Amino acid sequence: MATLISLNDANRMLIAESQEDFLQIACYDWISTANKAIQKRGAFYVALSGGKTPLQIFQEIVKKRAAISDCSKIFVFWGDERASEDTEAGSNYLKAMDILKWLRIPDTQIFRMDTANPKGDEIYENLIREHVPDTIFDMVMLGVGEDGHTLSLFPGTAALEEKDRLVVFNEVPQLQTRRMTLTFPIVRQARHLVAYIQGTAKQDLCHKLLHPLGRDTFPIERVGTPLNPLQWVLSSDCCRAADLADIPAECKLEMF
């Protein structure tokens, strides 16, 4: 079903054998994390990722929503959002809620980023501080771009070095825009950190992730820590056979 690879103390990769396995693993992990949080603490606080892959995962979650113990205990936030002028065409919020609406999460527990407001980042940080106990999310979902960015933490941008703020507007020169994003300080303290990669378009990225020497560190590689590792879920088509063969046997574990 999957191969577990321990890259280092801060990163653990689970490579699914098929696209179906990839979605099943991601869905099971999400629902299991939600149910454990609801059972232990009475609620599930999650920060969602944008991108195409999470939308597929959301579809699987909706199909299996009967397995969620109590959808009324879910509190939904976003990890990042596009500039206001792109909202209608590419809003992470709109795309996600078009699917997740079937979970019937109370509207008062769905927190959208307002990128049109110049102080939207401060407002969103205050919402997190008000509603998320100790500002610790139960789960933060992360996508990964071909340049190694995650959320809207792009290579070479100022938000990568933010030490105090939980949410900021980040200027992204390579896209000629700015985006609102969570920062490392709040992401790293989440109880469960998980990144998703799938598709042949990410093969070069995966090659670099598996061969980190001689290059700059990607933003996504700065998320996990030895005390709170980042769990990766990958589809088999994003990893070349030759790259997997390079991994020492003692770092791999076949799982069924």
From Swiss-Prot:
Q: Which UniProt keywords apply?
A: Hydrolase
User: EC no.?
Assistant: 3.1.1.31
Matching SUPFAM superfamilies: NagB/RpiA/CoA transferase-like
Give me the reactions it catalyses.
6-phospho-D-glucono-1,5-lactone + H2O = 6-phospho-D-gluconate + H(+)
Could you cite one Gene Ontology molecular function of this protein?
6-phosphogluconolactonase activity
**Pathway recorded for this protein:** Carbohydrate degradation; pentose phosphate pathway; D-ribulose 5-phosphate from D-glucose 6-phosphate (oxidative stage): step 2/3
Q: Does the keyword Ribonucleoprotein apply?
A: no
**What is any one GO biological process for this UniProt entry?**
pentose-phosphate shunt
Role according to the record: Hydrolysis of 6-phosphogluconolactone to 6-phosphogluconate.
Family, similarity comment: Belongs to the glucosamine/galactosamine-6-phosphate isomerase family. 6-phosphogluconolactonase subfamily.
Please report the name of this protein according to its UniProt entry: 6-phosphogluconolactonase
What gene name is given for the protein in this entry?
pgl
